Amino acid sequence: MLFNIPKREPDDVNKIIEKVQETAEFKPVLKVKNGTVLNTLELIKANVEKNLGTYHCLLLDSNEAWLDYCRNVDKNTIVSLDTETSGLTFKDQVEGVAGVCIKSLNQTEAYAPIGHISTITDDYYPNQVSKEAIKQGFDILNKRGSKYIFHNAYYDLVVLKGLLGYFVPVYWDTMVASFLLNENEPHGLKYLYDKYVMKGKAGVHKFAELFDGIPFNYIPPNIGCKYSAHDSKMTEALYLFQKPFLTKGTSECTEYKLEGVCDVFYTEELPLIPVLADMYWRGIHVDLNKVNELIEKYTKLRDKAKKEFDMVISTLREEILFRAKNNGDIEYPVNYNSPAQIKVLIYEILKSGVIFKKEPTGTGKHVLDTVLNEAKYKG
């Protein structure tokens, strides 16, 4: 005999069949803090239905559905994009892509699942969009001159680079714009949407907290769809709110004197996003812990300096208020970040005269040091 395989008796065969037919207890590959994975998924589903039950979006659950959506995007129009991943690390961005959220001005927001995994089988769900079809869809969008808008494009560009092989152009970033328009408030998408678009009527949904312990790519597409697609709708609405403030010539931009902010947004901030994304792609990353440490340090120094500055000029309060009322070129308290107001303070109210002939109306540190007699200018 070529192979000496032992012969099984009928009783042995029957035992094997019985063993196979037994229903084994399901042990999910994921762990959650409380209860089971399946129970947690039911809670997530219930909470999504509670908060967004009447909300309608599209689930693009096939290659053709995704491509049809892309084909129906109007030419040269705004397309809001967002990506969902299994986590926030670079590996999650490249290998753990769950799906792409999309909304064009002329269509309902939609979600295209790509990499959702069943918690039962630990295999990909059927009825998802292939990565090749995603590429084909973006080819269509690019040829139609789509203008891509994001909320935190820095993150999404890296995800899309992993899918497409290139960085898509950024037409607008609502998070960057929000920092420029008001740096002293939270800049999360849901907070900004609720405050500026819905005027506090939407509420900031907290149901995403239920995802704790379950990566988004393990959420069934039909459950995660409403949560994820809604992000692209909020991004579009926030963009439409911000656009007039950062467009020269509009009444909003003129009223709030935002022309200089427009220049910074269009010529510095937006072009910098793909540069930073490319650096991150190549392995260069900003140490956010160090950044936060420096922010805390210099915020304290700034606040201390401002307090001292306000105390010093408090004796000039009446003169400043008189000037503000009659000339309108200064305010009280004085905006120490405004060279124009500092110039008025030094040369018109303090009447210091020309301090440096080369800079007859200068407001640099050497000028301030001389005015305050804190240091001697050398040079």
Predicted regions and their residues:
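Conserved "right-hand" nucleotidyltransferase catalytic core of DNA-directed polymerases
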Residues: 1-118, 184, 196-197, 203, ...
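Nucleic-acid-processing active sites and adjacent nucleic-acid-binding tracks
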Residues: 105-148, 284
